[in-house]
């Protein structure tokens, strides 16, 4: 959704922008192409392989560009260290797992590739998916599968995991896929039986939804008046958080101590309806089929 991202960011030649999910640099390169000599772009990624890719592609040699290894919750710290708080003209968050992560068997994200059951977006993080599965309780696992994967057979799969790990460790993607296939009584001919479970475990291991919520809050704090927040989500759990956040900020509501409080001045204005990838992009990249882009603009105080 590159053209949609650029349209909603409305990149100015002298603006300051933050790409919170560098990946392999596609969005960052396009933003840099629209920046003049005074423009600045900060990229962030929690994956060290993505950070290394910035050097390999030559982007790190551009004086207008900088990259940091970190998470969404680090946005405020990185922006503040550059003296940009309240001056950022646009922030992009492209959620979920990246294509390079999915396609690399040793990262353990894909149920279609045999590899270690890792799933860490940040390889420096301590707990792998295999280690998490070895320790999580049956009740908590069922909750994660139900809440993060919307898996109708969450209880069956959780019970099967606990029974299997009593016999032997679950350490590879193949181990987990076989277990799931055996636990599910009915197969969906349009979806692999492991899809929801792999999504749920990945979200839990990486605290994706918690990081998203923190990142959205950080983003609004550092944006300039008129600055834009653009978020691409890939499943309903992510989109629900983004939609609710933008809606509540546009209404002047915020969560404090589990209770919504009303501000006198809303901080955001929602920019139109959510956008979807076009047919041409979906033909080139089928994973874009589920992408949904939402954008909002920060109001003047």
Curated annotation (Swiss-Prot):
A family per Pfam: Methyltransf_5
Annotated EC: 2.1.1.199
One annotated GO molecular function: rRNA (cytosine-N4-)-methyltransferase activity
Any one GO cellular component localisation term in the record: cytoplasm
Subcellular localization: Cytoplasm
EC class name: transferase
Superkingdom, natural source: Bacteria
Keywords from the UniProt entry: Cytoplasm, Methyltransferase, rRNA processing, S-adenosyl-L-methionine, Transferase
Known catalytic reactions: cytidine(1402) in 16S rRNA + S-adenosyl-L-methionine = N(4)-methylcytidine(1402) in 16S rRNA + S-adenosyl-L-homocysteine + H(+)
Positions that bind S-adenosyl-L-methionine: 25-27, 45, 72, 94, 101
Gene3D superfamilies xrefs: Putative methyltransferase TM0872, insert domain, Vaccinia Virus protein VP39
A Gene Ontology biological process term: rRNA base methylation
InterPro entries: RsmH, SAM-dep_MeTrfase_MraW_recog, SAM-dependent_MTases_sf
Xref: PANTHER family: 12S RRNA N4-METHYLCYTIDINE METHYLTRANSFERASE, S-ADENOSYL-METHYLTRANSFERASE MRAW
Family note: Belongs to the methyltransferase superfamily. RsmH family.
Function: Specifically methylates the N4 position of cytidine in position 1402 (C1402) of 16S rRNA.
Name of the molecule in the record: Ribosomal RNA small subunit methyltransferase H
Organism: Methylococcus capsulatus (strain ATCC 33009 / NCIMB 11132 / Bath)
């Amino acid at each position: 959704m590159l053209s949609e991202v650029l349209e909603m960011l409305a990149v100015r030649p002298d603006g300051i922008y933050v790409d919170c999910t560098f990946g392999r640099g596609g969005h960052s390169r396009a933003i840099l192409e629209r920046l003049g000599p005074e423009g600045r772009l900060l990229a962030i990624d929690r994956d060290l392989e993505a950070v290394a890719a910035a050097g390999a592609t030559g982007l790190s040699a551009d004086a207008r560009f900088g990259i940091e290894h970190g998470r969404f919750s680090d946005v405020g710290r990185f922006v503040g260290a550059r003296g940009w708080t309240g001056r950022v003209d646009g922030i992009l968050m492209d959620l979920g797992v990246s294509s390079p992560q999915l396609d690399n068997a040793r990262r353990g994200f894909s149920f279609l590739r045999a590899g270690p059951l890792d799933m860490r977006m940040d390889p420096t993080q301590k707990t792998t998916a295999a280690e998490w599965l070895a320790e999580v309780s049956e009740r908590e696992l069922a909750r994660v599968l139900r809440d993060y994967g919307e898996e109708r057979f969450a209880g069956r799969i959780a019970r099967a995991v606990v029974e299997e790990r009593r016999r032997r460790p679950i350490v590879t993607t193949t181990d987990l896929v076989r277990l799931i296939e055996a636990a599910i009584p009915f197969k969906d001919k349009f979806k692999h039986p492991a899809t929801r479970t792999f999504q749920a475990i990945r979200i839990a291991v990486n605290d994706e939804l918690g990081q998203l919520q923190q990142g959205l809050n950080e983003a609004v704090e550092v944006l300039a008046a008129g600055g834009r927040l653009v978020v691409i989500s890939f499943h309903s759990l992510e989109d629900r958080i983004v939609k609710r956040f933008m809606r509540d900020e546009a209404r002047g509501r915020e969560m404090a101590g589990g209770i919504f409080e009303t501000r006198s001045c809303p901080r955001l204005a929602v920019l139109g309806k959510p956008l979807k990838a076009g047919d041409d992009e979906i033909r080139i990249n089928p994973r874009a089929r589920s992408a949904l882009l939402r954008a909002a603009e920060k109001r003047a105080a």
